[in-house]
């Protein structure tokens, strides 16, 4: 039985019963279901709780808050205070915006209020409470995604209609709840599908990334809502306020009224005085809304003074003090025919005044803040401003055409048309003051009897009307009584006269008009009344309202008309007119009759609708000729606003605002005429000229939706808009769809298609049924031209208006036009002229420089207005950026292939030139005839080049085509002749020899003919060229020198024939030069990074400052012969420029040092190396000998330059000392490598701020170091050594400058590593520095000396860093390393952990397990106590300065002297003894350290090495765990690294615990870890690092370093310039520029001398002809050996003196890259990376 009740039929019947019984439930459900689609900002938090998976508690709190918020919104519909609080926009501005911004910042910092989860009392958790409040509060704000204004209107309408409002609200809430549940269920299904997807489940970290992205999206959406609300309603405090000009005038009038009230006599005396004065009353008006407003101080209801009215004791009314206010004559705007109530304070006649002003003023002061935020009149401006000749002031938004209120009709309350809402409000105030019990008793009996009487009366009137209509039909009269009557407004109860249609508000709007009737004299004579001109009565409603008062002067005397007599006359008149119309017809009737009838009708209606009062009454309006109409004064603001046009025209001279406040339509003022006037001022006796302009305002044709809107007003969102087209400029509503001329999208006109079909049939068919008009060709062309011109004009107007509509478009366009004009005038056209003339020169034709530049000078650019009117430079408009400009080009330049001779041109050509005399410049740099016109065609550079290239080819092609045509014709003739019947021969096989012989003859004949033709053509061309030149010379009448020039020209022509043969090779060389010098450099320039560009600018500025300082120092130094010295320098510079090699087209800043060495080595071979490869290629591959076209002079020149030898064998290189560098660099040159192993060369990134600060502090220290290095000549130790292997198996040389105490950082710092491929095979040889260094320093090194931060670990792929360092002793057996201890610092002695070779780099295997996330900064999570110490470690370096910095305090000074005296080098072979000394010192110093290292524990496991690196990477202390915890702790640390970057790491921790990735036994439960307990238990072993030893040198260095820090980077301290030590034995007779220069310049000088190789007596050290027996192993480059020839000593001194002669350009190349660096100017001879700016990808 229960199941049967749920059958579908029963459910349907139940629903039908509900619908039939009460439709409120259905409508409420429908409305509630619709509200689910009006999505608000609270949905963001609800979706966030569902998607972000914050737990069930958060989800439940979000849903409950959301539902309660929606319930409050539904209750606010029924409950008025909530509706006022939530529906006003003030709540959004004051409450919503701060709350939304707070939520936005709170969601960005999620853990701000997160105090942890408490499972027992979850409601006490603050985070859950915040989720509930967010969903509750944000639900109360207005919706923003889907507009709910239509739904709100439906609710308001239905709430008036339905009786059971509570049932409607509950049903709507239930409907919304159903829709909400369906929405949440659908969202849950989507989320379940996402979670169960296999792809998402397979990726572990995809969910965490998705959560991160969703959190960002929610925060962005929340920020958008904040911005949306902020733009929708302006802020109350920062918006511009209106200047209340009218309020000030109103206040003056009110002050005058108060004075009249205080001096007011009694009513009787006032009447007498007014009668005597003859004062006139113009209008009577009643209470307005502003009278009731508390701010106006008008209300005073005195409860003590009460008086009986009309002799009735039951009804009590308060006594009202009524006064009259005098005012000016102001016209009244008659808009609608409602009760004539004036809302303007000017026209108010009755004002209720207050006695006590003090209390009201206090009340106003208390409510200032409330009115500021919740002001009834609103703080901001209205939306529109209605204004005409009769009316000014902004209209209130609350005002409407009709007012509705609840009134009683037939004993029932119904909505009907009533008076203003202000009067109802005033009536409610009166009712509160009167006793309600007495009022109800008095009105109950009256109301019931009154409604019964009215019902009976209406029935009687209906029956009488029906009888009268039947009688009128029987008589066949066309009268008014025949028609059916309707409800109209009655004017008088006695006469039963009604208002006319013009004054009846219940009729349509079209009848309501303002009509002024001027009564003529003949009509006035016919009227029964005599005093109609002087006396007219006031409106009946005023009399009704004034009848309640006890004032006798307002009693009315009604003059009655006899209705029967007047009605019979009217009926007779109408019947007479109808008969005339029937008999004669409407056409024959005279118009004068109708005109007279209309006047009579109006006059009679006027008589019927007026009531005459007492003639002797002083309040009668005299001398009035207008009919008063019932009108309604619209509520207005007291602001006086003006438009932009009014402000410019200056109509308002008094009380003009500073700025216009109403937005006018977008327009442009076009100046038509300007006049100058002389203004004389009598007071000042000065004459001033004032310019007056006649301006024409041009409005754009496009729609402007902002016109008429007041600045700062609230913008209403446009609704009810229908788009007809894809792109629609104007907004249309569906109501006005019939008025649109445009056709809709899918509109199809059938008639036009039918016409086209029949027209085609008529053309095809022979019949003449359809005659088509035939126009002449001229007429059709004219029409087509007109249509084209019209289309072009329309297009121009549309483009011009489009520029106006786009914001800031005119500014951009005007700037672009100015740029285009300068670019055209000074860049494009001169470059075209240059290109043209260069092509002429290349083609051996005369250039036309003068003619082209003369025409270029004629082109003038004139700035015009936006419409194209030219302007002078003085009268240029100030607002040209906003208004827009045009640029007119007079005599535009056109590039011509040949400038013809100036002959007399025809009239047609002159007319054409005049037409094309000017043009307008477009934005794209093109030319147009008119502004915004389509650009015309013009000859571009490419067209010119194509014309030049293919001009002659076209001529040749035409000639060849003519010849081929002739040949084809001949062949045809021969074929016709030879096409005869040929009998078969007897021999079937003819002889083949004949056929071959004939073919050979034909070929030879063709070839000979072609050669003859070519020779003839060449001779003809020569003759033509010579004749042209001769004619040109004759025309110009050149002197005798022209003959010589002609002869030279003939010689050039002969030489051109030879060059034509060589053109192929010339173009080949030319293309290669362009490619190497132009394209490569341009590609490189485009790849410059921004950071490098900024760094370059900074360094250039620093360099210029440095050079200026050095120049001043050089000037101040004493120089015996400065003039001779400078002259020699200049001479040497000029010679060096001629003979030296320069890098063409390359930016020297980005050339690596190794590349510079390589190029220098190539330069030393020959100065003409640039063309050497091309010439050798030509010689070897094409000719195998010197080409025949080379003259003997050229051959000798090539031989002298060393490009070509007679034997063409392997030439021996010239003698120079840099050969080792060249061969080493040639091995490692990047082009010799394979493409797979080619390095990925990326631009070097700027160093971090930390390293820059260190570099700035170290700069002066490195200057000191460089000074010690360069001034160490007196020592026996050598500075530079070139080391080579004794064996020649591999024929390779490796040059190292390695000291024992050099940190590995110096070698590895400049290795640039790409993210994808860290260490390629091409860097292996370079990395051997590190391996060799590690092997020779006790076979063990500490990881702290290597700067691992240089390597970029941010790769996403697996990295195999094991290839970085190759520990293989076999590869380095042939290399002999020499250590020099004096060049670099000595390192702090520290403990090494293990002696195993794998222990140092084996940690890098953990990089194979790097996941797709970066390695994070782990310095803050483990032990925060070590952060300060770690920062201190960053600042302090691991090594201190070398002993060379402190000469007075050297260790083992005496021992070194004795060794040097006993075992000093005697020759070149003895130079290696210095190496043995340095090795012995190293062994002695490292002995103590090796003993300490043996005592330490060594790591055996890989995990220990990994952990040790991890801890040393991040902390200052060395932390080690016990052996049992190593593996588990490392796994935990890896997971911690992942969790640090996650927003919500809780769930990943849980999943990792389930997977047993994290061991909870290791993690301590306590919140605060105690280090002492961990150390006691043996979990952690903390070993402090031993700090550096503080010797005397160290303290002295610190004191000196403080004074050097504050100096500039390029400055050097003058104290150290005095500490130059010279040997006492040596005497310098010659002035050395080396001693005058600074430290850095000396370094450059020394190395330039080392690079010099121009010595005749030097040994040839070419490896091909090298002999080991003749040459010593260690060659000294700095020439410090005593056993050097005297000749060489003199040569060295000469080189030192004239050092600029040697590689000045090379010095410029090496200046930046090698020595002069911002990071400390380290003395690194090698910069490893080649071409840092190029990028090569595999």
Curated annotation (Swiss-Prot):
Its main location: plastid. It is found in: Plastid membrane. It is a multi-pass membrane protein. It comes from the Eukaryota. The chain crosses the membrane at residues 25-45, 66-86, 89-109, 126-146, 174-194, 210-230, 1059-1079. GO terms for biological process: protein transport. Signal peptide: none annotated. Keywords: Membrane, Plastid, Protein transport, Transmembrane, Transmembrane helix, Transport. One of its GO terms (cellular component) is plastid membrane. InterPro entries: TIC214. Belongs to the TIC214 family. Involved in protein precursor import into plasts. May be part of an intermediate translocation complex acting as a protein-conducting channel at the plastid membrane. Part of the Tic complex. This is Protein TIC 214. The gene is TIC214.
């Amino acid at each position: 039985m229960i199941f049967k009740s749920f059958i579908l039929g029963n459910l349907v019947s139940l629903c039908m019963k509900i619908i039939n019984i009460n439709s409120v439930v259905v409508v409420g459900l429908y409305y509630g279901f619709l509200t689910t689609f009006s999505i608000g900002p609270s949905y963001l938090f609800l979706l966030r709780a569902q998607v972000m998976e914050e737990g069930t508690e958060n989800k439940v709190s979000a849903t409950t808050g959301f539902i309660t918020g929606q319930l409050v919104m539904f209750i606010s519909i029924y409950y008025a205070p909530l509706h006022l609080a939530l529906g006003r926009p003030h709540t959004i501005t004051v409450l919503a915006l701060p709350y939304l911004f707070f939520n936005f910042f709170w969601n960005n910092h999620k853990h701000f209020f997160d105090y942890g989860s408490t499972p027992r009392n979850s409601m006490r958790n603050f985070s859950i409470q915040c989720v509930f409040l967010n969903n509750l509060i944000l639900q109360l704000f207005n919706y923003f995604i889907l507009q709910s204004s239509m739904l709100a209107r439906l609710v308001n309408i239905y709430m008036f209609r339905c009786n059971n409002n509570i049932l409607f609200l509950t049903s709507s809430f239930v409907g919304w709840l159903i829709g909400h549940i369906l929405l949440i269920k659908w969202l849950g299904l989507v989320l379940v599908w996402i979670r169960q997807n296999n792809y998402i489940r397979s990726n572990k970290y995809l969910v965490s990334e998705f959560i991160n992205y969703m959190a960002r999206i929610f925060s962005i959406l929340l920020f958008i809502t904040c911005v949306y609300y902020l733009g929708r309603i302006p802020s109350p405090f920062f918006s511009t306020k209106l200047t209340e000009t009218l309020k000030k005038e109103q206040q003056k009038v009110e002050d005058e009224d108060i004075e009249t009230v205080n001096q007011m006599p009694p009513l009787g005396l006032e009447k007498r005085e007014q009668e005597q004065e003859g004062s006139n009353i113009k209008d009577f008006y009643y209470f307005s809304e502003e009278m009731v407003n508390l701010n106006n101080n008008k209300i005073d209801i005195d409860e003590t003074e009460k008086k009986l009215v009309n002799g009735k004791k039951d009804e009590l009314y308060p006594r009202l003090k009524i006064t009259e206010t005098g005012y000016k004559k102001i016209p009244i705007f008659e808009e609608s025919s409602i009760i004539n109530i004036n809302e303007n304070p000017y026209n108010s006649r009755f004002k209720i005044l207050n006695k006590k002003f003090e209390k009201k003023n206090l009340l106003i002061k208390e409510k200032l803040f409330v009115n500021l935020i919740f002001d009834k009149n609103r703080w901001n401006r209205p939306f529109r401003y209605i204004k005409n000749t009769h009316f000014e002031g902004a209209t209130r938004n609350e005002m409407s055409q009709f007012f509705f209120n609840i009134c009683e009709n037939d004993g029932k309350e119904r909505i009907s048309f009533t008076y203003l809402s202000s009067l109802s409000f005033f009536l409610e105030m009166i009712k509160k003051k009167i006793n309600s019990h007495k009022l109800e008793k008095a009105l109950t009996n009256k109301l019931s009897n009154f409604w019964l009487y009215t019902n009976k009366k209406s029935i009687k009137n209906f029956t009488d009307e029906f009888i009268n209509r039947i009688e009128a039909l029987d008589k066949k009269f066309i009268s008014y009584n025949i028609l059916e009557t309707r409800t109209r407004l009655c004017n008088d109860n006695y006469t039963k006269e009604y208002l006319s249609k013009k004054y009846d508000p219940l009729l349509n709007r079209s009848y309501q008009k303002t009509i002024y009737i001027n009564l003529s004299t003949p009509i006035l004579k016919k009227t029964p009344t005599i005093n109609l001109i002087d006396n007219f009565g006031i409106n009946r409603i005023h009399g009704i309202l004034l009848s309640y008062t006890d004032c006798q002067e307002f009693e009315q005397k009604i003059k009655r008309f006899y209705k029967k007599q007047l009605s019979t006359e009217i009926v007779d008149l109408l019947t007479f007119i109808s008969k005339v119309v029937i008999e004669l017809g409407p056409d024959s009737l005279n118009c004068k009759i109708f005109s007279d009838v209309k006047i009579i009708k109006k006059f009679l209606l006027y008589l019927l609708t007026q009531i005459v009062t007492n003639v002797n009454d002083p309040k009668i309006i005299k001398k009035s000729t207008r009919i008063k109409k019932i009108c309604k004064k619209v509520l207005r603001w007291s602001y006086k606003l003006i438009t932009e046009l009014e402000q410019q025209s200056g109509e308002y001279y008094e009380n003009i605002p500073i700025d216009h406040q109403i937005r006018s339509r977008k327009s442009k003022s076009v100046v038509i005429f300007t006049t100058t006037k002389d203004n004389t001022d009598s007071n000042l006796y000065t004459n001033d000229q004032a310019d007056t302009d006649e301006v024409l305002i041009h409005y754009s044709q496009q729609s402007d939706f902002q016109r008429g809107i007041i600045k700062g007003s609230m913008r209403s969102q446009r609704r009810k808009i229908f788009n007809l087209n894809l792109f629609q400029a104007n907004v249309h509503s569906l109501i006005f769809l019939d008025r649109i001329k445009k056709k809709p999208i899918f509109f199809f006109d059938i008639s036009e298609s039918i016409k086209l079909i029949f027209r085609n049939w008529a053309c095809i068919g022979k019949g003449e049924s359809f005659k088509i008009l035939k126009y002449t060709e001229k007429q059709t062309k004219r029409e087509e031209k007109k249509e084209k011109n019209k289309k072009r004009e329309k297009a121009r107007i549309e483009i011009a208006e489009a520029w106006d509509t786009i914001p800031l478009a005119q500014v951009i366009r005007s700037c672009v036009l100015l740029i285009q004009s300068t670019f055209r005038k000074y860049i494009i056209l001169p470059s075209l002229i240059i290109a043209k003339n260069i092509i002429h020169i290349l083609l051996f034709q005369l250039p036309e420089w003068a003619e082209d530049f003369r025409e270029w000078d004629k082109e003038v650019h004139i700035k015009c207005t936006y419409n194209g009117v030219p302007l002078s430079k003085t009268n240029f408009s100030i607002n040209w950026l906003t208004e827009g400009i045009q640029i007119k080009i007079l005599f535009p330049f056109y590039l011509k292939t040949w400038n013809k001779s100036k002959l007399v041109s025809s009239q047609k050509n002159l007319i054409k030139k005049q037409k094309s005399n000017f043009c307008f410049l477009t934005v794209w740099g093109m030319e147009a005839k008119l502004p915004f016109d389509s650009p015309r065609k013009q000859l571009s550079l490419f067209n010119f080049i194509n014309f030049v290239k293919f001009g002659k080819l076209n001529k040749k092609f035409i000639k060849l085509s003519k010849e081929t045509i002739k040949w084809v014709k001949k062949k045809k003739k021969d074929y016709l002749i030879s096409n005869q019947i040929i009998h078969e021969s007897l021999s079937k096989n003819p002889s083949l020899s004949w056929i071959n012989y004939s073919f050979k003859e034909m070929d030879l004949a063709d070839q000979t003919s072609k050669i003859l033709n070519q020779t003839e053509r060449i001779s003809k061309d020569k003759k033509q060229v010579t004749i042209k030149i001769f004619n040109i010379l004759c025309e110009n009448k050149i002197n005798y020198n022209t003959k010589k020039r002609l002869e030279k020209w003939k010689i050039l022509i002969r030489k051109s024939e030879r060059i034509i043969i060589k053109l192929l090779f010339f173009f080949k060389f030319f293309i290669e030069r362009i490619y190497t010098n132009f394209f490569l450099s341009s590609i490189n320039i485009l790849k410059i990074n921004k950071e490098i560009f900024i760094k370059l600018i900074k360094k250039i500025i620093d360099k210029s400052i440095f050079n200026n300082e050095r120049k001043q120092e050089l000037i101040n130094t004493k120089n015996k012969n400065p003039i001779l010295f400078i002259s020699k320098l200049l001479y040497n510079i000029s010679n060096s420029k001629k003979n030296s090699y320069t890098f063409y087209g390359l930016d020297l800043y980005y050339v690596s040092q190794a590349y510079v060495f390589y190029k220098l080595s190539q330069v030393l071979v020959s100065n003409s190396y640039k063309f050497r490869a091309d010439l050798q290629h030509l010689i070897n591959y094409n000719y195998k000998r010197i080409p025949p076209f080379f003259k003997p002079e050229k051959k000798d020149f090539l031989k002298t330059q060393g490009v070509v030898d007679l034997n063409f064998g392997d030439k021996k290189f010239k003698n120079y000392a840099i050969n080792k560098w060249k061969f080493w660099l040639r091995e490692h040159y990047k082009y010799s490598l394979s493409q797979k192993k080619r390095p990925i060369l990326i631009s070097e990134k700027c160093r971090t701020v930390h390293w820059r600060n260190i570099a700035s502090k170290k700069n002066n220290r490195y200057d000191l170091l460089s000074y010690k290095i360069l001034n160490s000549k007196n020592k026996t130790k050598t500075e530079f050594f070139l080391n080579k292997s004794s064996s020649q198996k591999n024929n390779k040389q490796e040059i190292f400058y390695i000291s024992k105490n050099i940190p590995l950082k110096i070698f590895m710092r400049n290795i640039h590593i790409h993210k994808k491929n860290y260490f390629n095979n091409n860097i292996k040889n370079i990395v051997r520095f590190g391996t060799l260094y590690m092997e020779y320093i006790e076979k063990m090194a500490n990881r702290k000396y290597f700067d691992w931060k240089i390597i970029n670990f941010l790769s996403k792929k697996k990295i195999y860093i094991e290839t970085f360092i190759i520990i293989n002793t076999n590869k380095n057996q042939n290399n002999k390393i020499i250590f020099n201890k004096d060049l670099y610092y000595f390192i702090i002695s520290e403990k090494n952990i293990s002696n195993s070779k794998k222990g140092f780099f084996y940690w890098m295997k953990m990089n194979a397990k790097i996941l797709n996330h970066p390695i994070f900064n782990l310095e803050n999570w483990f032990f925060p106590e070590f952060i300060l110490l770690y920062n201190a470690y960053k600042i302090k370096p691991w090594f201190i300065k070398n002993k060379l910095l402190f000469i007075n305090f050297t260790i083992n000074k005496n021992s070194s002297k004795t060794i040097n005296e006993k075992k000093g080098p005697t020759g070149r072979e003895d130079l290696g003894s210095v190496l043995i000394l340095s090795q012995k010192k190293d062994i002695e110093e490292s002995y103590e350290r090796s003993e300490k290292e043996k005592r330490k524990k060594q790591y055996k496991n890989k995990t220990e090495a990994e952990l040790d690196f991890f801890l040393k990477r991040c902390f200052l202390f060395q932390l080690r765990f016990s052996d049992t915890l190593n593996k588990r702790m490392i796994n935990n640390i890896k997971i911690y690294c992942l969790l640090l970057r996650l927003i919500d790491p809780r769930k990943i921790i849980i999943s990792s615990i389930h997977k047993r990735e994290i061991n909870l036994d290791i993690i301590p439960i306590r919140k605060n870890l105690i280090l002492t307990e961990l150390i006691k238990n043996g979990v952690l072993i903390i070993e402090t690092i031993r700090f550096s030893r503080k010797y005397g040198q160290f303290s002295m260095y610190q004191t000196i370093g403080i004074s050097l820090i504050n100096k500039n980077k390029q400055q050097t301290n003058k104290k150290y310039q005095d500490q130059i030590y010279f040997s006492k034995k040596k005497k310098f007779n010659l002035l050395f520029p080396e001693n005058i220069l600074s430290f850095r310049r000396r370094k450059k000088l020394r190395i330039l001398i080392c690079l010099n190789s121009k010595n005749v007596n030097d040994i040839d050290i070419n490896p091909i002809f090298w002999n080991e027996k003749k040459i010593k192993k260690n060659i000294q480059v700095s020439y410090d050996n005593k056993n050097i020839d005297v000749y060489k000593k003199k040569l060295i001194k000469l080189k030192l003196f004239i050092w600029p002669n040697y590689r000045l350009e090379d010095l410029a190349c090496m200046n930046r890259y090698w020595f002069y660096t911002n990071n400390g100017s380290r003395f690194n001879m090698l910069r490893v990376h080649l071409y840092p700016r190029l990028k090569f990808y595999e």
